[in-house]
Amino acid sequence: MSDLVRVAVDAMGGDYAPVEPVKGAVEAVNADERVKVQLVGQVDVIEKELQKYTYPKERVEIVPATEIIETGEPPVNAIRHKKDSSIVVGMKKVRYGEVDAFVSSGSTGAVLVGGQTIVGRIKGVERPPLAPLIPTKDGVSLLIDCGANVDARPSHLVQFAMMGSIYMEHVVGIKNPRVGIVNIGVEEEKGNALVKETYPLLKENPYINFVGSIEAREIPNGAADVVVCEAFVGNVILKLYEGVGATLISKVKQGMMTSLRSKIGALLVKPALKETLKSFDASEYGGAPLLGLKGLVVKTHGSSKANEFKNSILQCISFSEEKIPQKVQEHLADYKSSREAAKDGV
């Protein structure tokens, strides 16, 4: 049992709590015997939902939490005053090593504040970024940052690139991942002040495989494995991605139902088409890890259904087994030392 990856799940956060978080947790433990889930929230409500399912009882626990942080609440006040909320209780589980990860679709602000103040940042990390996987032509890329730091500095973006590279190599399995910075052109002199200042720092960084600037239209083509940007740009890209994906799926389904011929054709291509459209479904990729913390915190969409919870829980396995926080701390410390040595002329 000690080898199991322990994941706490906020059963009270999000638009469809507790139904979808509980269902997703059950699907996760049924899908992979390496994971154990602790459902955090109101006991009677969670127990009622669990009665619907068959699952290995020894790998699902309930952790009591009587309070709920609502989306509209000021995050700092909510974290400070609602000590028995599902988010605070779950975060403390990570902080004290009682679980390996925490997954929540609750208030984004509360998750960001709780991650930094309760779980805590890794030594050397300036700003923890949110980093979701997004689909590309041949696989996935990591979009970093997509919502945590709207006023980032060049040093923050450099750290995002390094943390993103570690994640893609050790969790996703892409060796020597390519890092690109989002820009309005591919030329080195293009961009706003932030991009222009960040570019040379990324170019000279020996810990990443920097491929230069990438335009937004090249992101779906897989121009980079790690797509670096500040949070405002990243959030716009993410929301556009999700909107286009949902629209594409809807339009294809509509087109297949327009005539008898199209319906027959749809039946012939259904298996391949279903698999292709599945790649545009955001829930297939799980939530966005808040990288740079001492433990793993994953933020899922507020509208997450069971499938996204399941995939978010399962992505915690590789993160935990590969000891990502330790790798991040080591790489950042080495980078800092090399920068200081260069300044001293060593």
Regions from the language model: what does each represent?
Residues 55-99:
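Phosphate/nucleotide-donor binding subsite
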Residues 8-19, 148-158, 299-306:
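Short, glycine-rich nucleotide/cofactor-binding loops
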Residues 19-20, 32, 36-38, 43-47, ...:
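Glycine-rich phosphate/diphosphate-binding loop of Rossmann-like nucleotide-binding domains
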Residues 116-129, 133-143, 223-227, 231-341:
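Glycine-rich phosphate/nucleotide-binding loop
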